Swiss-Prot record:
The keyword Cytoplasm applies. HAMAP family: CH10. Heptamer of 7 subunits arranged in a ring. Interacts with the chaperonin GroEL. Keywords: Chaperone, Cytoplasm. It holds the Pfam family Cpn10. InterPro entries: Chaperonin_GroES, Chaperonin_GroES_sf, Chaprnonin_Cpn10_CS, GroES-like_sf. This is Co-chaperonin GroES. SMART domains: Cpn10. One of its GO terms (molecular function) is unfolded protein binding. It is found in: Cytoplasm. One of its GO terms (cellular component) is cytoplasm. Together with the chaperonin GroEL, plays an essential role in assisting protein folding. The GroEL-GroES system forms a nano-cage that allows encapsulation of the non-native substrate proteins and provides a physical environment optimized to promote and accelerate protein folding. GroES binds to the apical surface of the GroEL ring, thereby capping the opening of the GroEL channel. The gene is groES.
Length: 103
């Protein structure tokens, strides 16, 4: 089996799925105490890196996604599948798990 090199440009979400680059979590508290990885909360904000073609309707047509590449989004805390590419963290989630677009 041939090895596949993954990068953001090679990942194309299917259906209504969205590939989001996770924002960095806080490294220390407001009081200056450094947090270990086990104490950090899972981030819920990220930037859309790739978008699928949209959900398929009953008549076979596609419903265009409401978010686009570059949008900053807020998503459900435990939604999606975590993926690490190099040193960057991503989450692949369904569009319904996106709660809001953040300006």
């Amino acid at each position: 089996m041939a090895a596949v090199s993954l990068s953001v440009s090679t990942v194309k979400p299917l259906g209504d799925r969205v590939f989001v680059k996770v924002s960095e979590s806080e490294e220390k508290t407001a009081g200056g105490i450094l947090l270990p990885d086990t104490a950090k909360e899972k981030p819920q904000v990220g930037e859309v890196a790739q978008v699928g073609p949209g959900k398929r309707n009953e008549d076979g047509s596609r419903q265009a996604p409401e978010v686009g590449v570059g949008d900053k989004v807020l998503y459900s805390k435990y939604a999606g599948t975590d993926i690490k590419l190099g040193s960057d963290e991503y989450v692949l989630l369904s569009e319904k798990d996106i709660l809001a677009v953040v300006n």
